[in-house]
Amino acid sequence: MNKAIITVVGQDTVGIIARVCTYLSQHNVNVLDISQTIIDGYFNMMMIVDYANADKDFGAMVGNLEDLGDDIGVRIRCQREEIFTKMHRI
């Protein structure tokens, strides 16, 4: 299993989750967990995904997700799980 953490932050609008999940499913990336909240009109989502069977390499997927975020009007970041864990350790 190759896990990654995807974060999405920005103004809430219709279809954010749908657009991100559609991209992931089209490229055979499995969503393992998802947490989403909206606070005062700001959308925040964190996903744990498995990209072991993805049809794109990790770097291409990261770039595509950033471009998708630009299209939607949110910021999308994707990091390998081990990098995310090391960066957020206290």
Swiss-Prot record:
Gene3D superfamilies: 3.30.70.260. Residues 5-79 form the ACT domain. NCBIfam families: PRK00194.1. It comes from the Bacteria. Belongs to the UPF0237 family. CDD domains: ACT_1ZPV (cd04872). This is UPF0237 protein BL1209.1. Disulfide bonds: none annotated. Transmembrane segments: none annotated. InterPro entries: ACT-like_dom_sf (IPR045865), ACT_dom (IPR002912), UPF0237/GcvR_regulator (IPR050990), UPF0237_ACT (IPR022986). PROSITE patterns: ACT. The lineage of its organism: Bacteria, Bacillati, Actinomycetota, Actinomycetes, Bifidobacteriales.
